[in-house]
UniProtKB/Swiss-Prot annotation:
Transmembrane segments: none annotated. This is Ribosomal RNA small subunit methyltransferase J. The keyword S-adenosyl-L-methionine applies. Gene3D superfamilies: Vaccinia Virus protein VP39, YhiQ-like domain.
Length: 257
């Protein structure tokens, strides 16, 4: 994939070399003309994070993954916990904490909610840039003194690029979660920023329908598909039941035995 690759680290050649190796392994090629840039941004003297920037729209700011601070820290401390819609849809109830495969992990937000209530979540992300952003966020979360231990236990990024590469006999989970990219109508600042950057990067998941069947083969209890309230069913397949929220719908499918 062609994208601008930038490092803002000026004092540690080992860190810039690490960034280059990560990009090469992900198949990223530097393109000076690309309006999108993956940036290794400095955080103090000895730390860094990866950011995705849309250079022709700098007011959008940078997109990055931060599980230990900001919005995600607030959500972990003051959010609904087990009462969050995604947790209910996955099947969190009482002492029941399903194991989960998040097959469209993205920036890992919903997976983090599930991990924060105690679910063990394995993540799959196929887009190389998004995967690097997620991997970087997990790296820093694993090192965090407050959440590091639970994050290492409950959130794991798998090496596969697609759930079809997983073996239902060995790699199954109680629940498989799907949240494919879909054109958004919402106008909130967060959605507007991230969707404008992300849709420029990956577009919509035009082959998202192909996720449903392998997900139903991997799931032992349910597949949960998050959809905007105005969207049709994934793969034009009616769910067995749905849970509705203000702006979204969780379509729930039973496994294929």
């Amino acid at each position: 994939m062609m994208i601008q690759l930038r490092s803002e680290i000026k004092t540690d050649e080992n860190l810039t070399a690490l960034f280059r190796r990560q990009c090469e392994a992900a198949g990223l090629i530097h393109d000076e003309t690309s309006p999108l840039a993956l940036v290794q941004a400095a955080m103090g003297e000895h730390d860094w994070r990866l950011e995705l920037r849309k250079l022709d729209e700098p007011k959008l700011g940078a997109v990055f993954v931060d599980f230990a601070g900001g919005v995600m820290a607030h959500r972990r401390k003051f959010g609904g916990g087990r009462g969050e819609a995604v947790a209910k849809a996955i099947g969190v109830k009482g002492e029941e904490l399903p194991t989960v495969i998040d097959a469209t992990a993205g920036l890992g937000r919903d997976a983090f909610v599930l991990a924060s209530v105690g679910c063990r979540v394995r993540l799959v992300e196929r887009h190389p840039v998004v995967r690097l952003l997620l991997q970087d966020g997990l790296r820093r979360a694993y090192d965090d003194s407050e959440i590091g231990e639970s994050m290492r236990r409950n959130m794991q990024l798998l090496t596969v690029n697609h759930i079809a590469e997983l073996d239902p006999a060995r790699d199954f989970a109680d629940a498989v979660y799907l949240d494919p990219m879909y054109p958004h109508k919402q106008k909130s600042a967060l959605v507007k920023k991230e969707m404008r950057v992300f849709q420029h990067l990956v577009g919509t998941d035009s082959d998202a329908d192909a996720l449903l069947e392998p997900a139903r083969k991997l799931a032992r209890k349910r597949v949960v598909v998050k959809r905007p309230d105005y969207a049709g069913f994934l793969a034009q397949t009616p769910p067995h039941f749905s849970r509705e929220t203000k702006n979204h719908r969780f379509d729930i499918y039973l496994p294929l035995i």
